């Protein structure tokens, strides 16, 4: 049985978001549902409507 995780990735670079997604989806024992966020404005909007289990954020997110 696998554990379901909702993870939000707040990162402006699509390449880095894609790399993180590839690594996270390979974790054994987890079903990963990702929310990709490219800007600080989208981050605030997303967090109002979604409650991720984990947030991975670039501290210099524009």
Predicted regions and their residues:
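Conserved acidic carboxylate
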Residues: 11
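Structural signature of beta-strand start/N-cap positions in the alpha/beta core
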Residues: 6, 33, 51-53
């Amino acid at each position: 049985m696998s554990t379901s995780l909702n993870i939000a990735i707040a990162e402006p670079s699509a390449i880095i978001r894609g790399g993180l997604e590839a690594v996270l989806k390979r974790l054994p024992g987890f079903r990963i549902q990702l929310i990709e966020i490219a800007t600080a404005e989208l981050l605030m909007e997303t967090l109002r409507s979604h409650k991720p289990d984990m947030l991975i954020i670039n501290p210099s997110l524009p």
